[in-house]
Amino acid sequence: MLCASVILISLFVIDLDHKRLPDPLTVLMYPVAVIGLAINGLATGNWPIGSALLGAAIWLLPIGGIWVLSGGRGMGMGDVKLAPALGLILGWIGVGSAVVGLVSGWLIGGVVAIVLMLVGRARSGTAIPFGPFLIGGFAIGMVAGAVLSDAYMGAFGF
């Protein structure tokens, strides 16, 4: 996953600077993810393909839905292209990790947007790069997604 980390750090910085996620890097996440997950499957004998695909769908549906419903104004196509790759990787770990990662990214992005509005650095309609928040949520999902998901489900008796 070192290759994925290098790509994601690059995308994070580029999106902050230019408010876009370039296709050559975004699309590269797919073969990197698939190869990395295949290596993991071969090494462990664990092939949670259904969970990985569900993770990809969990990430794609809300982000793609916002892009479609807003005519591309509420979310960039780079975010739409990146999301399923991130969800695929987190879904391989577990659906809970995919959900935690996505929700974390949304929450952090929302809090930052509100703070920017409160301090006058943004207003309604201001373009705020969302890729860094997706990548941050992905990192949270990778590191603590399973633990946070289990704790949340346990708190509600599931």
Located regions from the model:
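Interfacial loop-to-transmembrane junctions
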Residues: 115-140, 152
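Short basic/hydrophobic patches in alpha-helices and adjacent helix-turn junctions
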Residues: 88-92, 104, 113-120, 138-142
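Membrane-embedded alpha-helical bundles of polytopic integral membrane proteins
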Residues: 1-16
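Functional transmembrane core segments of multi-pass inner-membrane proteins
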Residues: 10-11, 18-110, 150-158
